[in-house]
Every structure is written in C-alpha cells, then in structure tokens.
Amino acid sequence: MQFMFPLPHMLRLKATVQPWEASVTGADQTRMVKRAEELGYDMIAVPEHFIIPRSHVDLSGPHYFHAAAAQGYIAGATSRIRINSCITILPLQHPIVTAKALSTIDWMSSGRITVTFAVGWLEEEFKLLGVPFHERGRMSDEYLAAIIELWTSESPSFEGKYVSFKDVAFEPKPFQKPHLPVWMGGDADAALKRAARFASGWMPFLTRPEDFPARIDFIKSQPAFRGGPFDVSYGVATSRVGEGHKVNRDP
C-alpha cells in the first residue's frame, strides 16, 4: 500500500475543502510538497481543468492547474516523490503536445511521473476549446495509441481520424521504460475497457469500495488486458453532499 498526499488548494470545491485552503499560496504548496516527501508520502496528484463556465463555478469551483505544468514544478521542487495527475483531460490538448510535455517531465525528473488520463465531462469546456464533446471517447482511444507510439517507437508513425504523423523524430523519450505509467480515470464501462487496453492503473471517482472487486475483475476480463501488476487508487477522504455526480455514458 502507498499513500498519496492531498495537497491543499489544488482546487476549490465548497463541499469537499476547508475554507482556509483558499489562502494557501504557491510558496506554501512548495513547502508542503517538500515536507510530504520528508514524511514518506509516495505520490502527489494534480487535478486539471482549463476554463470553467460561470454557471459551473458553484459546483466545480474556479481554481485548477494545467496538470503537466504543475507536475513539472513539483518534480523540480522534490527528489523522490512520484507525481501523478487526477486527471489529465486527454481530448482537450493535441496528443503530440501532451506526449512531449509528459516525456519531458519524466526525462528531467529521472522517471517520477505517472499520468491519469480521462475523457472529461464538462461539455461547455469542450465547446470553449473547440473540441467535439460527443467524440471525446473515440478521440481518447486514438490519442492514447498515438501518444504511446511517440513514446516507444524510434520511428513513430500513426494514421488516424484525429491525428496522423510519419517520418518524424520524437525525443526525449520517457525515462521510464517502455514508457511512464498510464492510469485511466473514471467509472464508466468504456473507461474501464480503456484501462484494460492502455493502462497499468485505475483511478475511480464514484465507485463504492464494495464494488471494487467486480470492477477490477471487469478490467482484467477484457480481451485487451495485458496482465501484470495493476494499480488502483481510492480517495478514503472523499465526501459527497446530496445526490452528487452520476456516471455519464462515454461515447
């Protein structure tokens, strides 16, 4: 078992954070991540959104980081602890840019990066960034395959609907081999199938602890599951007020 440090002021959700967290500065966070490393914590994970419509601020809060940028900063401020995302919204950035950002951080940190990808849920955010919301699942499948091709092939080549490349060079490759660990976030069946195909870990959001065995069995029963160790994260401090979120269909 490993432990993830819940760094304050990574987001501001009224239902789940303490009011004092809004006063935590970047300098405070830097001291905290260093102390978390000294205390033996194993991982820090960074949430991500790019832009929040005013109509969603009461639900989602206004304060989020660009996950890869924050991961890079935390990696530079520490020497041992692993830095994950929770989550990186895969369809909202070009996969070549995402692959480059993560391989750069992994290479420079000597292999301390994990990424948790998910397809996203906030339709208005997709509209603001010009990304087709109802194609996000298909885009994510293609983007994942393209990113792994860039990370692992000496002569990367990919042909798809949303991204294509050939006759290209891509370095640095990730420090970790064959590539940095990829986890999948989400609770929908499509997310778990994606985890079986592409990932070595799963970060659920709504799954109840008593349902974990069945969901893990579902992942491992998929034809694309490659076997081997498979990590699962669970936020024991997660709280919910009222009905809360529901799992949406992942196209």
Regions found by a protein language model. Name each.
Residues 1-77, 177-180:
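N-terminal beta1-alpha1-beta2 module of alpha/beta enzyme domains
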Residues 1-20, 80, 122, 161-179, ...:
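N-terminal small/glycine-rich loop or linker at the start of catalytic domains
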Residues 3-5, 44-46, 82-85, 113-117, ...:
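Hydrophobic faces of well-ordered beta-strands that scaffold small-molecule active sites
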Residues 8-10, 49-51, 88-90, 118-124, ...:
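Active-site beta-loop-alpha junctions enriched in small/polar residues
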Residues 23-36, 97-102, 184-197, 243-251:
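Short, acidic/polar
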Residues 54-58, 91-198, 213, 217, ...:
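Internal, glycine-rich beta/alpha segment that forms the wall or movable "lid"
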Residues 57-84, 139-150, 217-234:
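Alpha-helix-loop-beta-strand connector modules within alpha/beta enzyme cores
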Residues 77-80, 109, 196-203:
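Glycine-enriched alpha-helix->loop->beta-strand junction motifs that scaffold or abut catalytic
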